[in-house]
A protein has these predicted regions:
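Bacterial Sec-dependent N-terminal signal peptides
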Residues: 1-31
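Conserved, well-structured interaction surfaces
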Residues: 90-165, 205-209, 220-229, 415-422, ...
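Membrane-proximal, proline-rich intrinsically disordered regions
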Residues: 19-75, 319-321, 331-336, 342-362, ...
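Hydrophobic-face positions in mid-chain alpha helices that act as interaction patches
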Residues: 67, 264-427, 483, 498, ...
Length: 561
């Protein structure tokens, strides 16, 4: 933690010198600031503000080509579920070890990247929060401050849900290797007031303390963010704060059902305040704009061709998530694919089924060829790792994703294709949170909300026989898993609801997971309690004996035999 603190102390000092009060004291002995000074201060604060969303897309190609920013962490969460797989072990698949549950302990570089990236992002928010005195700030600066609080709340809500130890069948008593019970412990809190001395002995916050801290940030964001005049969806606005509160209360409700009412309240506020409708079939299946258009979402990340990640060509979201590019990692073999059993549960009259290939490509079957002609970006692409003279689509396994299109549908020019958008929050998620939160209290009411959403926006013929709380909640989560596939959210639902991950099966369909990834868990997987890296313990003694137990290699591979 001291290392993280030192890395940003210079920036913090610089930012601190830019506060309105500081400017007044240096150049204006009286109590009034000139208009020019105020404008200069606001300009400086704006630079700090825009640095926050920009930092989400920072890549670290020298450390490994899986290090392409927040999108990579979203993808790691999905890799740890049973819904999304990469069709390769090792070689070009840099995410193999998360899927294979290997090297997840404190001494490995894989966890190091997540930890370092997350806390560096936290520090970008702390820098702006430290720089603005709300008592003397202009309305414009208050808007910036509200956005910073929202970003920080997002970061800590993620960290809390990733690192909080929850009991599982592998470690049912919550004890780690040192014999200490770590159930309910999250991560150390580093805020704008944390000193180097404090960081050296900063224990993991309890669930209760972390919840209090996050809610404080969210309440401040809710109060201040209406002053934000920038309309860019790379910044959070009031609808996003409501959305974060909905996620927050769902997290708390995992241990205390009384919070479901508040989750439902804020989810409804979020989709009403968003002022946008769920994506249509045309939006979702567009060859040029499918899931790369930030205007369709509440909140997202936006890359431009000047971004370092885009300029690398291959260390970015599109390289890893768009199977149709001729230059990226995905098309080189580690295709990103949907779980066979999940795909089976999508009916053909649900247009979302067409976000994944129904079969392997062939020109010999007219129906198959017609499907690819309708939904593929460019059947004329002549590239594949295994067959340089063949059509790219010939090597794709069944259930390959077409969901995340390269920007402008361009599959060959990395500087164009990589300038894409990545979803952080969609209005669809809020509808599913609303339905689930209601279902835990009144299953019939939650079911009615689900049916209304599905019939209106996804499948006019949708129906479900679910009636009990468990049945209705499971059906809502199923539809949410399909809807938000690849967007990094399913991990949190599986963990909080103590749901199993099933990758090995032969009925009613045969598994499409590689042997190295075929684990079946009984309840939440042990690997969803992420381990704090040793470098943190080296500088923050308080976490050393209170880390999560290492989940690596704690499950036996499923076999049909």
């Amino acid at each position: 933690m001291k290392n993280i603190y030192k890395a940003f102390v210079a920036l913090a000092v610089t930012a601190g010198s830019l506060t309105t009060t500081s400017c007044i004291e240096e150049t204006e002995p009286t109590s009034a600031a000139s208009e020019e000074q105020v404008m200069q201060s606001e300009k400086s604060m704006a630079s700090l503000l825009w640095g926050i969303p920009a930092s989400l897309n920072l890549e670290d190609a020298d450390g490994g080509h899986y290090r392409f920013g927040y999108g990579a962490i979203m993808h790691i969460r999905d890799i740890q579920t049973g819904d999304l797989l990469r069709y390769m072990y090792g070689q070009y698949n840099h995410f193999s070890n998360w899927a294979a549950n290997k090297y997840q302990g404190r001494d490995y570089a894989y966890g190091q990247y997540i930890w370092n990236f997350s806390y560096k992002f936290v520090q970008t928010t702390n820098t702006l929060i430290r720089a603005i005195n709300v008592e003397t700030a202009t309305d414009t600066e208050k808007g910036y401050l509200g956005a910073a609080y929202a970003f920080r709340a997002m970061a800590y809500l993620d960290l809390a849900r990733e690192y909080e130890f929850l009991p599982n069948k592998v470690f049912p008593d919550g004890k780690n290797e040192d014999g200490n019970v770590v159930t309910g412990l999250t991560v150390p809190i580093v805020d704008e007031n944390t000193t180097e001395q404090t960081a050296a002995n900063n224990p993991r916050a309890t669930r209760e303390k972390m919840a209090e801290f996050i809610l404080s940030d969210l309440n401040k964001a809710e109060e201040l963010i209406t002053n934000l005049t920038f309309s860019s969806k790379t910044l959070p606005h009031l609808d996003c704060v409501y959305g974060l509160k909905a996620r927050y209360y769902m997290w708390l409700a995992g241990e205390d059902k009384q919070y479901y009412a508040q989750a439902a309240e804020y989810a409804q506020k979020a989709f009403k305040a968003a002022g946008i409708s769920p994506m249509t079939s045309e939006d979702c299946l567009s060859k040029s704009k499918g899931f790369n258009d930030i205007s369709k979402w509440m909140w997202g990340m936006q890359l431009v061709k000047e971004n370092g990640a885009v300029q690398t060509g291959i260390v970015n979201w599109v390289s890893w998530m768009s199977n149709e590019t001729t230059y990226g990692y995905a098309a080189a073999g580690p295709y990103v694919v949907m779980d066979a059993n999940l795909y089976r549960q999508i009916p053909w009259d649900d247009f979302r089924k067409n976000e994944w290939t129904p079969t392997t490509f062939t020109t010999q079957d007219a129906d198959v060829l017609a499907w690819f002609q309708k939904y593929a970006c460019d059947l004329n692409n002549i590239y594949s790792r295994n067959n340089p003279d063949g059509i790219l689509y010939q090597n794709m396994p069944v259930y390959t994703s077409f969901k995340f299109r390269p920007a402008q549908g361009n599959t060959v020019n990395s500087s164009i294709a990589g300038a894409s958008a990545i979803p952080l929050m969609r209005v669809e998620e809020m509808y599913f949170i609303y339905a689930e939160a209601l279902a835990h209290v009144n299953p019939a009411q939650g079911k009615a909300v689900l049916q209304s959403f599905m019939k209106k926006y996804r499948n006019a013929n949708y129906t479900t026989d679910a009636t009990t709380e468990e049945e209705v909640v499971n059906e809502i989560i199923l539809q949410k898993r399909i809807e938000l596939w690849g967007e990094g959210q399913t991990f949190f639902d599986i963990k909080r609801l103590n749901m199993s991950v099933t990758r090995g099966y032969s009925d009613p369909v045969k598994t499409n997971w590689l042997e190295q990834y075929r684990f079946n868990t009984d309840g939440r997987p042990s690997w969803m309690n992420w381990v704090i890296v040793q470098t943190e313990g080296n500088t923050n003694a308080a976490v050393n004996d209170y880390n999560n137990p290492d989940p690596s290699d704690t499950y036996k591979e499923w076999s049909e035999d």
